[in-house]
Structures are given as C-alpha cells and as structure tokens.
C-alpha cells in the first residue's frame, strides 16, 4: 500500500509546496488520488529554466516557450480563486508582457502575501498593493521595458529584512509612471528616471535625496508625512540645521523639489508646503509650471507661499483646496492674515490667470482672503469658488452672492474678469466685471 498517498490532503499540499510547480504537476500521473492535488498548493514556483535548455534549437525553444506559457495558464485556471500565499516567478527570456501581467494580477487578486521576482525582461506595467516583495540574493529585478511602477503599502525585503530605514534607489530609463505610497521612514531615496512623466510620492521625509533625475516630468504630487514634533522643531526660531538631525532631514527635501523643477502640473499637500518653508532660500524656479494645486489645513502654515509664487514665472492656474491655514508672520505677503504695508507684494509678480477656491465655507476670513487675491493678482481673469459640500456653510448661498457682487463693484478689473460660484460641482451664478 502507498503510505504517502494515504496521508491527509493538507499534509500532501504541504509536501508539494517544497517542489517547483512543474515538479508538483508531475505527481498528477501517479494515480487518480494525485491528479489535481498540485492545484491546491498555496505556493507557486514558476521557473522557466526547468523548461528551457541552452542546447535547444531556436525553433524548439520557441515551441517550448509557448508550451511553458500554456502550462502556467492552465495551472492558474485549475486553481481558480483558491487563496495563494507565495508566487515565485523566475523568467530568464522574453515573454508576452500581457501574459506575465495577467499571472501577477491573478496572484494579487487571490491575496498573495509574498512575491518573489527574478529578471523579467518584457514587463511594461507592474502594480503591487499591500504585498511583501522579496529581492532575491541571486540578483536584482531587471525591468528594462518597464513604463509604469505603482507601489502601494509594499514591504520591500532583502534577506527577510524590512526596508524601513534602508536606502531605496529607483533607476529606470524607460519608466513613465512612478507611485510610491507607504508610511515608513526611508533612509535615502534616489530616483533616476529620465523618461518619467508622472510622479506621486506619499512618504515620510527621507534622510536624504542623493539623486533626483526627472527632467521630463509632466505631473508631480508630493504628500509628505510628518509628525507634529517635526513641524514644531521646523518652526522654532534660531534653528541650528547642522546640530538638529530632524530639521536637517526636512531641509534635504529641497533636493527632491529641485529634481522636479521641470514639472508642468504640481500638487503639494499641507505638510509639504509647511516643510518647504525651510527651503525658501534654495527654492528652484519652476519655469514650466502651468498649474499649481495647494491643499491647506488650519494647522499647517503658508510660509513658503510667497517665494513659491514668485518662482513660478509662467503659472496660469492656481488651485487652493481650502484657504484657512496656520497664521505666522512669514506668510503675510501671500495672504492678509497679518496686516502689513507690503501685503500682497508677492502676488503682484505672479501671472496667474485662473484662481480656483475649493472647500469654501463662507467664513468672514475666507471672504477677506478672496478679496485679497482678486485685488493683488494683476493678470487674474477668472475666479471659481466651490462651496464646501461636506458640512453646512457658515453663510447661506444668497449671502455669499451678496459678498461677491459687492466685491465686483469695489475691485475694478478688466471687463473680461469673471467670478463663478459653484455648488455641488454645478454653476450657481456667474458675475462679470462691468
């Protein structure tokens, strides 16, 4: 009697998990009992080297490649939606990138928690969400054709060591889209991606940014994660940058900002805007920037706003997602929070033509801020005010309309200047200067 075959299914699954997927599949010929056991193994080990051999002729190798891909497709189909723990994918020759995308997507959809990749030549798009990626000791992942890389809540590991606090280097000449979103503290972060057109970075501030090459960037979204302690230390007077490692880390953000200076569309979170207050003296000039979106929060300041607006000589659209912010004596040129003779001077050199105010609640402070912008932006042609939908406004819509009408009477602009009030995303009323 075959004593192994008499073991429970769970034990046999465990035994088969130590074999490659091809080796596990070969057990299906042993008996009916083994026919489909391999399809329930939670670990997939797909290695083209067990199919392809250097001595094979070119035509034979092509047929073997096709057979290999059909084998992988069949295994995944037989497994259906059963849970999977680990996918080990080792490909040393070119394959249909859409096929490979499908294999990885299949594993991700089935809840894979460990992804093991080795040299994939033709992969164009790779999106990883909430998985652990094991960088093999045998070599790096080589993706020369990659154009889109999205990492969301991904644990990058080397020899089972979490990359939190480690140096991260992304280098790819063909990559077009890069999204990094994870709440860990990095060591250094370098990115050498000359073809990149979209960059989304949601991270704690790294220790340093030694290399930042993104000269063809079209859109950037920077959302730094900082602690309240870091903010307080950044605001402290007489900061000693050399002695304070926390502040020095924040100051090094200037290297990342300089690396994206060719961008045309840029979004900055409240934390990012506050941290930039430490980089005002080294703020780059954004010669290509056409649209700037700034998100505000009542606990974060606008200290960097004056120099940022001055350094956008071709800015056309300014989007403010909220205009209430932490008041300091350093943001006054860009707003009217603090009374001073020179108020508004940083706005007079800004060529912005379209101003969008989102999340408007109708407070007196907000209305004064809008008046301030309308008065000091010399090239302003259009102002769009979006009423906040997530709560009752401080004033009723008719009162807001009265305020806008009065503002249009007292603040003379070109006859082509107009203000639009939008409620729920729809135009409620429009005013045009007389």
Curated annotation (Swiss-Prot):
Domain F-box stretches: 1-47
Alphabetical list of Gene3D superfamilies matching this protein: 1.20.1280.50, Ribonuclease Inhibitor (3.80.10.10)
LRR repeats, residue ranges: 125-153, 157-182, 265-296, 297-322
Keyword Repeat attached: yes
Pfam families: F-box (PF00646)
Cystine bridges: none
Keyword annotations from UniProtKB, A to Z: Leucine-rich repeat, Repeat
Signal peptide from the UniProt entry: none
Annotated protein name in UniProt: Putative F-box/LRR-repeat protein At4g13960
């Amino acid at each position: 009697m075959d004593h192994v075959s008499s073991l429970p299914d769970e034990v046999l699954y465990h035994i088969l998990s130590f074999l490659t997927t091809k080796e596990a599949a070969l057990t299906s010929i042993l008996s009916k009992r083994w026919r489909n056991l391999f399809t329930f193994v939670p670990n997939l080990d797909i290695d083209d080297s067990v199919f392809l051999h250097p001595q094979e002729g070119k035509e034979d190798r092509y047929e073997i490649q096709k057979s290999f891909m059909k084998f992988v497709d069949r295994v995944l189909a037989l497994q259906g939606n059963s849970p999977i723990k680990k996918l080990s994918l080792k490909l040393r020759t070119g394959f249909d990138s859409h096929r490979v995308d499908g294999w990885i997507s299949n594993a991700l959809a089935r809840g894979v928690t460990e992804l093991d990749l080795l040299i994939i030549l033709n992969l164009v798009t790779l999106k990883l969400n909430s998985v652990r990626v094991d960088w093999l000791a045998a070599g790096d992942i080589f993706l020369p054709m990659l154009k889109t890389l999205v990492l969301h809540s991904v644990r990058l590991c080397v020899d089972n060591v979490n990359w939190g606090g480690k140096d991260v280097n992304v280098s790819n000449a063909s990559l077009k889209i890069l999204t990094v979103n994870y709440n860990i503290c990095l060591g250094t972060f370098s990115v050498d991606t000359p073809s990149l057109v979209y960059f989304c970075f949601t991270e704690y501030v790294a220790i340093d940014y030694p290399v930042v090459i993104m000269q063809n960037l079209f859109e950037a979204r920077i959302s730094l994660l900082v602690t309240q302690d870091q903010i307080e230390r950044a605001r402290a007077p007489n900061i000693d940058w050399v002695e304070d490692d926390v502040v020095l880390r924040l100051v090094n953000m200037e290297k990342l900002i300089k690396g994206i200076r060719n961008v045309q569309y840029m979004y900055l979170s409240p934390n990012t805007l506050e941290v930039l207050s430490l980089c005002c003296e080294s703020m780059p000039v954004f010669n290509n920037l056409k649209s700037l979106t700034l998100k505000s929060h009542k606990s974060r300041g606008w200290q960097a706003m004056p120099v940022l607006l001055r350094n956008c000589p071709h800015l056309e659209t300014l989007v403010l997602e909220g205009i209430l912010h932490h008041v300091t004596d350093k943001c006054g040129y860009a707003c009217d929070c603090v009374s001073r003779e020179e108020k508004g001077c940083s706005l007079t050199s800004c060529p912005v033509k379209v101003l969008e105010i989102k999340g408007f609640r109708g407070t007196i402070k907000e209305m004064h801020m809008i008046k301030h912008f309308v008065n000091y932006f010399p090239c302003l042609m259009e102002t769009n005010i979006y009423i906040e939908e997530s709560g009752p406004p401080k004033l009723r819509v008719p009162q807001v309309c009265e305020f806008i009408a009065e503002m249009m009477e007292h603040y003379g602009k070109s006859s082509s200047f107009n203000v639009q009030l939008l409620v729920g995303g729809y135009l409620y009323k429009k005013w045009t200067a007389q």
